[in-house]
C-alpha cells in the first residue's frame, strides 16, 4: 500500500526572511543561520514555516512498538474507523517528537557543534492527527539566554495540520545550542 503524500504548498510567511524580500510561491526553507550568534537576528520573529510532511501509519506503528503504547486508536484501523476520529490517530507524543526534525527543515544552523533538548513547557495537543495527515512546523524564537559555551533558546512551536484551522500541537520548547570550539 502506498502512503499518501502532501501536495506542494507554498508558504505564506516569507515576509519574515532576513532580507525582507518576499518570494511568492516558493518554499524558502531552510533559512541559513550562521552560528549561535546568528540566532539573535531571529529573536522575537517567526521563521518561515517548514515544508508539509506526511505522517504515515507506518510511523505511528513504529512509535507504538518503540514506546509500548499500542492503544487501538493508534494501531487498529478497523476499530478506529468506528471511533469518534474515524481513523487511527498519531500519538500526541509522536507529534511532539517531530519538533526537532521540523526545526531542521526550517533552519540550517551552521557552526554549531550540537543542540540538546532542555525542556518542554505548556504542551497542548489541540487537534488529533489522523494517519496520513500532512503536518508542518512553525517556530518563533522568543528568548535567547547565554550559557557556558553557547545559548539556551526558547521557542514557541506550532505544528499545523493541513485542512484544519486549529493546530495539532502548541508548545514552548527549550534547547541548548553549543558553538563549535575554535
Predicted regions and their residues:
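Catalytic strand-loop segment that frames the active site of acyl-thioester-processing enzymes
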Residues: 17, 24-90, 107
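HotDog/MaoC-like acyl-thioester-processing domains
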Residues: 2-41, 128-182
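Generic structural detector for well-ordered beta-strands
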Residues: 48, 52-54, 124, 174-176
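Hydrophobic beta-strand-centered segment that forms part of the acyl-chain substrate-binding groove
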Residues: 83-87, 94, 100-138
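A generic structural signal for short beta-strands and their flanking turns/coil linkers
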Residues: 49-51, 59, 69, 112-121, ...
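Predominant activation on well-ordered alpha-helical scaffold segments within soluble catalytic domains
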Residues: 61-64, 96-100
Amino acid at each position: 500500500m502506498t502512503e499518501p503524500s502532501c501536495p506542494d504548498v507554498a508558504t505564506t510567511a516569507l515576509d519574515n526572511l532576513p532580507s525582507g524580500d518576499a518570494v511568492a510561491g516558493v518554499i524558502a526553507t531552510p533559512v541559513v543561520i550562521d552560528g549561535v550568534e546568528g540566532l539573535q537576528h531571529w529573536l522575537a520573529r517567526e521563521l518561515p514555516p517548514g515544508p508539509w510532511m506526511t505522517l504515515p501509519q507506518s510511523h505511528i506503528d513504529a512509535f507504538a512498538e518503540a514506546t509500548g503504547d499500542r492503544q487501538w486508536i493508534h494501531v487498529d484501523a478497523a476499530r478506529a474507523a468506528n471511533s469518534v476520529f474515524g481513523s487511527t490517530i498519531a500519538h500526541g507524543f509522536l507529534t511532539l517528537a517531530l519538533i526537532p526534525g521540523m526545526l531542521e527543515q526550517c533552519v540550517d544552523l551552521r557552526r554549531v557543534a550540537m543542540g540538546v533538548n532542555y525542556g518542554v513547557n505548556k504542551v497542548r495537543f489541540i487537534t488529533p492527527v489522523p494517519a496520513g495527515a500532512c503536518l508542518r512546523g512553525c517556530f518563533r524564537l522568543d528568548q535567547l539566554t547565554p550559557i557556558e559555551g553557547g545559548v539556551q533558546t526558547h521557542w514557541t512551536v506550532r505544528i499545523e495540520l493541513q485542512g484544519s484551522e486549529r493546530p495539532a500541537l502548541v508548545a514552548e520548547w527549550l534547547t541548548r545550542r553549543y558553538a563549535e570550539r575554535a
